[in-house]
């Protein structure tokens, strides 16, 4: 009889330990694959899961490349982008999209294709961030604003090729 309470405590402790390990693994998995978290820069960007097999590590590598290769562009991404979706949408398999709505008055959601590799992904992130900045500045969406953002992705491509 005296052994049962200790046995019950051990069982409860074991269940809590297993639950703690499961929760820790879940949190690490979510952060590893679905969150860019840069404590030093106060930058947190969520990443949606890919429905077509693209790995979010390309987006994380692109953000790390921006962080070291173009700190100013990295700060802009951190300030204006809350979520990155790696699934092809309106930009198709080679581009990206900026979604503008009243819900994006804070930080925006962008779609980014990772199909063409790291440097192209960086350029798409910078391009779509340019649209987010235009929107947050209150500029009306017009086709001629596209020229400015194409200039931004061209600039970052040239800068990173020289950086590498």
Language model features by range: what are they?
Residues 137-164:
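Post-HExxH zinc-binding segment in Zn-dependent metallohydrolases
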Residues 25-42:
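Membrane-interface motif at the C-terminal end of an N-terminal transmembrane signal
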Residues 109-125:
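Short pre-active-site segment immediately N-terminal to the catalytic Zn-binding motif
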Residues 123-136:
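Active-site recognition of the HExxH zinc-binding catalytic motif
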Residues 47-53, 111-116, 136-141:
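Second-shell loop/turn segments in exported
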Residues 41-104:
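Auxiliary, metal-adjacent structural segments of Zn-dependent hydrolase domains
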Residues 6-26:
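N-terminal Sec-pathway targeting helices
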Residues 1-2:
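N-terminal intrinsically disordered, acidic low-complexity segments at the extreme N-terminus
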